[in-house]
Amino acid sequence: MYRTMMKAKLHRARVTESNLNYVGSITIDEDLMDAVDLLENEKVQIVNNNNGERFETYVIKGPRGEGGICLNGAAARKVQPGDVVIILSYAMMENAEALAHQPKVAILDENNRIVEMLGTEPASTVR
């Protein structure tokens, strides 16, 4: 049996831009992608803390060190610059692997800089 487990999480990312006229996807600072092991074209779920929207798209690399989080194409209708979002990816794994799995969770500040890295999802991530 396979289980779908959280693999990566960028917690409390701030949307820096939305670009309706781009083909699609979410552009993420490549440093943030590396921190939580996201790959270009990987499917992600976006949860908008400001309006409750949940949707899926795929990742494209953004410039390193700028903290950019840009929703593109139709997804741009779901966010506004300044919105706080959670970016999640999942992986399917067999039960034994799932029991030992530790996701990569990055807690971000208001400038999308990593303030803490976690190896699991704690009971409270209120910061």
Swiss-Prot record:
Pathway annotation: Cofactor biosynthesis; (R)-pantothenate biosynthesis; beta-alanine from L-aspartate: step 1/1
PANTHER family hit by this protein: ASPARTATE 1-DECARBOXYLASE
UniProt GO MF annotations: aspartate 1-decarboxylase activity
Name the record gives this protein: Aspartate 1-decarboxylase
GO CC entries: cytosol
Active-site feature positions: 25, 58
Class of the enzyme per the UniProt entry, highest EC level: lyase
Family: Belongs to the PanD family.
Binding site for substrate: 57, 73-75
Alphabetic keyword roster: Autocatalytic cleavage, Cytoplasm, Decarboxylase, Lyase, Pantothenate biosynthesis, Pyruvate, Schiff base, Zymogen
CDD domains tied to this protein: Asp_decarbox
GO BP terms, alphabetized: alanine biosynthetic process; pantothenate biosynthetic process
Post-translational modification (record): Is synthesized initially as an inactive proenzyme, which is activated by self-cleavage at a specific serine bond to produce a beta-subunit with a hydroxyl group at its C-terminus and an alpha-subunit with a pyruvoyl group at its N-terminus.
Name of the gene: panD
Protein role: Catalyzes the pyruvoyl-dependent decarboxylation of aspartate to produce beta-alanine.
Positions of modified residues (Pyruvic acid (Ser)): 25
